Amino acid sequence: MFDSIRFLNEGKYDDITTTYRYFANAKIVAAHGLPRYCFYRHSGNNSSAATKHHLLNPVQLNEYLAAFRERTEYISKILPQLAGLALYSEWSYMISMVEKIHRYGLNNCADLLELMCDNLRAHWDDFYNGKYILEFEKVWMDRYVK
């Protein structure tokens, strides 16, 4: 499996484009409740915007959005029983970024903000009335997308 699923040569966030593929293609997955995946996040780390919100930029956000789109398509094909959850996860990421852009005044992401809001509006019924959405996501949808 590790020979056929490789890290990409382009992009900065290789784990978001590969890790789910390992799980989706594994014959057996064991879970025991203890975190085993960790990394050191320093000021120059590619994903430092996850905790230092002012660092979020359109290039990073666009790469993440593309990775979520690709993941939704891949999981829907390989594990169709998880298609709804994968789609929810993509929309959940979008609404979390919409909220973050508003809260931190990230005007450099205005174009992607509009794109995400348009996408969420187009799928309002499926996301807002879906079985996975959390209450705070509904609040954010009402506040930022409606």
Cite the ranges covered by each PLM segment.
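Conserved nucleotide-sugar donor-binding catalytic segment
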Residues: 1-56
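Membrane-interface aromatic/basic loop that binds lipid-linked glycans or pyrophosphate carriers
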Residues: 101-146
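Secondary-structure edge/capping motif, primarily at the C-terminal ends of alpha-helices
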Residues: 43, 50, 75-78, 98-105
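Amphipathic alpha-helical repeat scaffolds of TPR domains
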Residues: 85-99
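Flexible helix-coil transition and linker loops at the boundaries of alpha-helical arrays
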Residues: 74-86, 129
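Residues within HEAT/ARM-like alpha-solenoid scaffolds
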Residues: 59-66, 81-89, 111
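Amphipathic alpha-helices of TPR/Sel1-like and other helical repeat/solenoid scaffolds
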Residues: 63-74, 116-121
